[in-house]
Amino acid sequence: MNPGEPADPAPVPLPEPKRLGTLARLAPEPMKVVLNWGRRYSLWVFNFGLACCAIEFIAASMARHDFIRLGVIPFAPGPRQADLMVVSGTVTDKMAPAVKRLYEQMPEPKYVISFGACSNCGGPYWDSYSVTKGVDQIIPVDVYVPGCPPRPEALLQGILKLQEKIARESLGERYGVSPRPSTAALQSGLVRPPEPEPEPEPEPEPEPGQGPGQGPGSGEGTDTGSDAGRGR
């Protein structure tokens, strides 16, 4: 740049645009409270039972504990109809892709409770080569319930903690740019499956009139013109 030429202007920093839904931008504060109240007491739960902690989840859903009185509806038909996933039991590297796939099929807003020591950090099998060291390596988790296995009362306490979190949520944070990491950004630490061996290519079939090993480039069975020169 010559001394007489003006310097280039410095770039102006612009704030990163945030995409908020129409409901998040236009709903007044009383309406946000009503929407949070509705989501808080209408959690349709999908139980991903992998080990003995799933039995405690079933016990919590029976008449003695009856978590339906807390607004939790058990046994959703599938992940596409569920609001809450409860991962109970040991998550292995082989099962981890299925857990992640079912989580991605759940509609927003969706929540996850890690139920039991095995789901939290691997539990007594943490040093096994095939055990995922916590389901939070695959999907984001909202509430951790410790225990091996936890009692049904511990799950009820975890549900109450999740409902308190939902009541404090902002629709702008939930439906806009969420601070929760995406499932693609999380490190899974899974064991890569072996790649299939390539299939051998089939050998070309010989043309009619050619024997095995005779081809257009083999030099056999072709007239090069040298025999005609010898007969002269």
Swiss-Prot record:
Binds 1 [4Fe-4S] cluster. Its EC number is 7.1.1.-. It comes from the Bacteria. Gene3D superfamilies: 3.40.50.12280. It is found in: Cell membrane. It is a peripheral membrane protein. Its cofactor is [4Fe-4S] cluster. Residues 196-206 have a biased composition (Acidic residues). GO terms for molecular function: 4 iron, 4 sulfur cluster binding; iron ion binding; NADH dehydrogenase (ubiquinone) activity; NADH:ubiquinone reductase (non-electrogenic) activity; quinone binding. Residues 210-222 have a biased composition (Gly residues). It catalyses: a quinone + NADH + 5 H(+)(in) = a quinol + NAD(+) + 4 H(+)(out). One of its GO terms (biological process) is electron transport coupled proton transport. Residues 173-232 are annotated as: Disordered. InterPro entries: NADH_UbQ_OxRdtase-like_20kDa (IPR006137), NADH_UQ_OxRdtase_20Kd_su (IPR006138). Its main location: membrane. Keywords: 4Fe-4S, Cell membrane, Iron, Iron-sulfur, Membrane, Metal-binding, NAD, Quinone, Translocase, Transport. [4Fe-4S] cluster binds at C52, C53, C118, C148. One of its GO terms (cellular component) is plasma membrane. NDH-1 is composed of 14 different subunits. Subunits NuoB, C, D, E, F, and G constitute the peripheral sector of the complex. NDH-1 shuttles electrons from NADH, via FMN and iron-sulfur (Fe-S) centers, to quinones in the respiratory chain. The immediate electron acceptor for the enzyme in this species is believed to be a menaquinone. Couples the redox reaction to proton translocation (for every two electrons transferred, four hydrogen ions are translocated across the cytoplasmic membrane), and thus conserves the redox energy in a proton gradient. Belongs to the complex I 20 kDa subunit family. This is NADH-quinone oxidoreductase subunit B 2. It comes from Streptomyces coelicolor (strain ATCC BAA-471 / A3(2) / M145).
